[in-house]
Amino acid sequence: MLSVQIENIGDLAVVECEGRIVGSEAAFKLREAVTSQRDARTVVLDLSEVRAIEGSGLGMLVFLQRWAYDHDIRLKLFNPTKSVQDRLEHAG
C-alpha cells in the first residue's frame, strides 16, 4: 500500500511517498499525486519511506518524467531507500 502527502512551497511541490509502489493501484495513485501539481515548476518525489518498487512503479516513474518534461516541470527523486535505489540502477 502507498500513502502520499503533498506539500507545496511556492512553485515547488514535495510529494512524500510512504509504503510500497507495487501494482497498478499504487502506480496510479503516484501518477495522480504528481500530475495534479500542474502549477509547480519543480516536483520532488520523496522516496525516503518507500520500502519497495516493482515494474509498474518503475514504468510510472518513466511516464512521470516524460509528463513533467512535456509540461516544463522538473521532476526530482529524493533520498530513495537502498532497495529502491538498487531497483532504479538495475532498471537503467
Regions found by a protein language model. Name each.
Residues 1-16:
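Short beta-strand/loop segment at the start of cytosolic alpha/beta domains
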Residues 21-92:
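Amphipathic alpha-helical interaction surfaces in cytosolic regulatory modules
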